[in-house]
Design a protein with these regions (language model features):
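Nucleotide donor/acceptor-binding cores
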Residues: 4-5, 70, 143
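Short, charged/polar "capping" segments at the starts of alpha-helices
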Residues: 40-45, 108-109, 155-157
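Rossmann-like NAD(P)(H) cofactor-binding subdomain of soluble oxidoreductases
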Residues: 52-136
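Short, well-ordered alpha-helices that flank and scaffold nucleotide-derived cofactor binding pockets
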Residues: 21, 25, 86, 90, ...
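NAD(P)-dependent Rossmann-like dehydrogenase/reductase catalytic/cofactor-binding core
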Residues: 2-3, 30-31, 218-305
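Internal alpha-helical scaffold of NAD(P)-dependent oxidoreductase catalytic cores
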Residues: 90-91, 114-119, 134-237
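Residues at the C-termini of beta-strands that transition into short coil/loop
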Residues: 36-38, 62-64, 102, 124, ...
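NAD(P)+-binding Rossmann beta1-loop-alpha1 motif at the extreme N-terminus of oxidoreductases
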Residues: 1-58
Length: 305
């Protein structure tokens, strides 16, 4: 595997923009691009982006301008992934590595089905407190990219990605059990994303001991843990507590993506979270009342947009 020299990012929300900012600062604007379809390009090409209050010049390209990338980071919403597959195709070359920052547990499968499993390294992005409104990104905690492989044949590409991230001081970890990490993050999102949206609060609200948002968050996470265990993923109460503690370390004023969706009146990823828990609970014969409540409440909120 050759050295990674250029990066293409799909998705220019909070995570994608933050990753682009961090990487561009290290390898230069000419080596980092945001790839988007023509409609999104026309909407964003003249926008003034700001990162933590300062203007920042990103390079945005269309599929017609795209060239094969050494590394592609997919940071769309889960709801936008299938559409993004066509957009990113011109950037996928023979040696391209693809990693996904998308929530949920199936984005790697979708990417591998389209572009080949030999290109996809499993990843989880966690611990960020990025918020993105308009074209302005604000964050204090850059978080960490957790990386891992399921197929040992991918070891060489994982080592190349590890070397690249080390060379630019990009915070990441190499996971021995990436599947466990992916499902752990899913458990967290089921709680924190949905509770923050429903109760219109940020990380501060769900970190307050005894508060209703926190109680609902933890209850939803326990239901996610239950169905994950039934699927053969051994999530534990210690995993749950660790993620709850992680949320308390984030900026109290910041909020996860679903809470931002409510502010921006955008459709959320509730199907990915409560929807998945409910479907798996039905499959295994469980009841998950907290997620059923959250699903119903999010549907009511979105119906009012």
């Amino acid at each position: 595997m050759s050295t990674i020299k250029n990066v293409t990012i799909i998705g220019m929300g909070g995570l994608g923009t933050m990753f682009g900012y961090q990487i561009q600062n290290k390898i230069g604007r000419e080596n980092v691009s945001f790839l988007m379809d023509e409609v999104r390009y026309q909407k964003n090409k003249d926008a003034v982006y700001k990162v933590n209050g300062e203007p920042y010049d990103f390079r945005i390209v269309t599929p017609a301008e795209a060239k094969p990338a050494d590394l592609i980071i997919v940071a769309t919403k889960a709801t936008g992934l299938k559409e993004a597959l066509d957009t990113m195709e011109p950037a996928v070359g023979p040696e391209t590595i693809i990693i996904s920052a998308i929530n949920g547990v199936i984005s790697e499968e979708i990417l591998a089905e389209r572009f080949g499993s030999e290109k996809v390294i499993h990843a989880v992005a966690q611990g960020m407190d990025a918020t993105f409104f308009g074209h302005e990104l604000n964050y204090k905690k850059p978080g960490v990219f957790c990386l891992g492989i399921i197929d040992p044949a991918m070891q060489g590409k994982l080592e190349a990605l590890d070397a690249f991230f080390n060379s630019i001081d990009f915070v990441h970890t190499i996971e021995n059990d990436i599947r466990h990490r992916i499902w752990s993050k899913f458990m967290l999102n089921v709680g924190v994303n949905q509770a923050c949206m429903v109760f219109e609060t940020g990380y501060g609200g769900i970190s307050e001991e005894g508060s209703l948002p926190r109680l609902v968050m933890v209850s939803a996470m326990r239901e996610a843990k239950l169905v994950s265990n039934a699927e053969g993923i051994t999530l534990t109460e210690d995993d749950l507590v660790g993620y709850v503690d992680l949320m308390a370390s984030l900026s109290p004023e910041s909020m996860p993506s679903m809470a931002q969706d409510r502010v921006n009146k955008k459709r959320s990823e509730v199907e990915l979270f409560a929807g998945t828990v409910i479907r798996l609970a039905k499959k295994h014969g469980f009841i998950v009342p907290t997620n059923e409540y959250l699903y119903k409440r999010v549907m009511e909120i979105e119906a009012e947009y």
